[in-house]
Regions:
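A structural signal for isolated positions on well-ordered beta-strands in alpha/beta enzyme cores
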Residues: 73-75, 119, 136
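A short, structured active-site edge motif that brings together acidic residues
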Residues: 77-91, 95-114
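Active-site neighborhood of HAD-like aspartate-dependent phosphohydrolases
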Residues: 1-41
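Short catalytic/ligand-binding loop motif for oxyanion handling, primarily in non-cytosolic enzymes
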Residues: 5-9, 76, 83-87, 114-116, ...
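Conserved Lys-Pro-Asp/Glu-containing loop-to-beta segment of HAD-superfamily phosphomonoesterases
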Residues: 105-131
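Short, acidic loop-to-helix structural element flanking the phosphoryl-transfer center
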Residues: 47-76, 83-88
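Acidic, Mg2+-coordinating phosphoryl-transfer loop and its flanking beta/alpha structural elements
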Residues: 121-155
């Protein structure tokens, strides 16, 4: 739904005055891209107030989710427990970008395996591998190695899968 990788690149540039765009290369992660002496500081970026507040929405996300909502009951599950300052930012982001999703269909959780839906679209392997329904991977550089899931490279792929 958002470009979290872009936020890491932006904050890295501000903090170290260096480019981290290599993070966008498929297969790259923070752990294999950031110099070891900076990694601990970079891993703290999402723990800062405001990290999630104004993340850009991915192209097509709003339109496709709105179309999906006409055929399916849509829930947004976000793993918010890891980053204690993100609740308000994430909720405000959802109200701004997906105002048609009712608050009753927004789930803040730590472990997405509790979500009892038919499908889960996620970029994190830890969420996909514990999901009991059909896990679907949304492409991000850190999950390029995943081969066992149906993969969506963009929101048009999601529309093609569910709306055709």
């Amino acid at each position: 739904m958002t470009d979290g990788v872009g936020r890491f690149i932006e904050l890295y540039q501000k903090e170290f005055n260096e480019d981290l765009s290599a993070l966008r290369i498929p297969g790259n992660t923070l752990q294999n891209t950031v110099p070891p002496d900076r990694l601990e500081k970079v891993l703290q970026f999402p723990h800062q107030k405001g990290f999630f507040k104004d993340l850009p929405i991915k192209e097509g996300c709003r339109e496709v989710i709105q179309q999906l909502q006409e055929r399916y009951e849509i829930y947004v599950a976000t793993a918010a427990m890891e980053f204690e300052l993100c609740f308000t930012d994430k909720f405000d982001w959802l109200k701004q970008h997906l105002p048609f999703i009712p608050w009753t269909h927004i789930v803040f959780c730590g472990d997405k395996s509790i979500i009892g839906t038919e499908y889960l679209i996620d970029d994190a392997e830890r969420n996909l591998k514990t999901f009991t329904g059909t896990p679907l991977v949304f492409t991000a550089p850190h999950n390029a190695h995943l081969q066992e899931y149906t993969r969506f490279d963009n929101w048009q792929d999601v529309a093609d899968y569910f709306l055709k």
